[in-house]
Amino acid sequence: AGMAGVSVATVSHVLNHRDNKVSPEVAARIRSIIKEVNYQPNTVAKALRSSKSSIIGVMTEDLSVWQTGSIVQGVTHYAQQNGYSVILSDLGLKDKIKTDYDSIYKYRGVISKELQRLQAVRVDGVIFIGMHDRDVKGLIETDIPLVYAYCTTENADDVQVGYDNREISKKITQMLLTCYGEEIAIIGGPIQSAPAGQRMAGVEEAYADAGISMNLKLRQNGNWEFESGQQACRDILK
């Protein structure tokens, strides 16, 4: 304000895009000085005044899991396009949980601590990205607006973003049957896994619609790990 020879209120009008309250010449001078000194607004202070921070918290079960990085990238790009910043909190649970995905509930304390950290910077909302597509009902309790991605919850009030395992699997199988015939090898996840069951149901529905019987010798189940998939391929190719 001092460098521009104007009041703090006038600078605030320009920073908050209320240019109709400032003459074009003054607004241009203020913007030039802002660029010259590389001024960065204090988002926390702004949040304290307005109760809105324009910051989204993204919490990942584990950033190293193959699909998570792409989801975070998509969230970040969309947030930036809409004037939001993103704070990432990676729980790093892959090596602790391994394939015992339901053991995530053992780490509710860790999740709660990270939520408190995000609350401290007054995020407007949190996106929780799972590392496995399964039900996490009751995992997180918070008053912050929360969206689940790549995991589900049976709570009717929870907001979640995902996809239809059964329908996608059905369409993929229909395409393969049309292009390559009926001898298709199927490698699925654990039999007790809900998403694996949904995907297999889609495969079976596609076969039924085509009036073709599945060759059960070409059907194997694994545990989501690369080594398991390799072994399933070997068993099918014997």
Name each region found by the language model:
Residues L118-G130, A185-G188, R219, I236-K238:
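Periplasmic-binding protein-like
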Residues A1-S53:
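N-terminal helix-turn-helix DNA-binding module of bacterial transcription factors
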Residues W66-Q67, I191-R199:
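Glycine- and acidic-residue-enriched helix-capping/strand-helix junction motifs
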Residues I30, V75, V203:
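Aromatic/hydrophobic pocket-lining residues that form π-stacking "cages" and hydrophobic walls in ligand
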Residues V159-I186, A201-A208, F226-D235:
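Hydrophobic alpha-helical segments within soluble ligand-binding/sensing domains
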Residues A79-K106, I186, E204-Q230:
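Short beta-strand elements in bilobed, periplasmic/extracellular small-molecule ligand-binding domains
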